[in-house]
Amino acid sequence: MDEGWDAYLRYLTRIIYNPSSALLPVIRQERARIGSPDNQIGVHIRCGGQLSDINEYTAFVTKDIMASIPGVVRSAINGSAIPRDKLFIFLSTDSSLVVDMLERELQPIPIKTTAVYTRGHSTIGLVSDDTLKRSFVDMFLVADSKELLLTSSSAFSRIVQWMSGNKHASAIIAPHSNSQGRWGRKRNDSVSL
């Protein structure tokens, strides 16, 4: 077991982000429902902007970047040592459009997401109790992944990587950009991928 400084800081980070006693059984229940982390590639896709279910001014993954993501996820699958008959993707995202697209594009690979609480943001001004709880559940479930594919400019992705101890996570390159999204509004149904 690695008991160096990095391991100590990971333990400390997990304590700081320690979920409440009410949330721990939810995380365990979701883990049991989703499946073993040994068979899981954890993927965090942070869209923001107009692709997010709740719009923001700042965009991360845009439509242009999104077009490349099925190929990036396929590359992660092809490079994985996880047996194909057991492999699944655990997806954490702020966009139901992303979930729908990856389910369609990556068949027959199972795409699994948290089934509890509400998809949204933990950003000040947009956070609700439900979205914060979902963020915690997602954070712990993604961090348990055998392999990771994370959004390069997302603080959530960096925390997940740090908590996981996985120094070799793959990245979806998605720099911050400004969007025409109106802060806090539900995504316009005319926006599609």
Locations of the language-model features?
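Secretory-pathway luminal glycosyltransferase catalytic domains
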Residues: 1-85
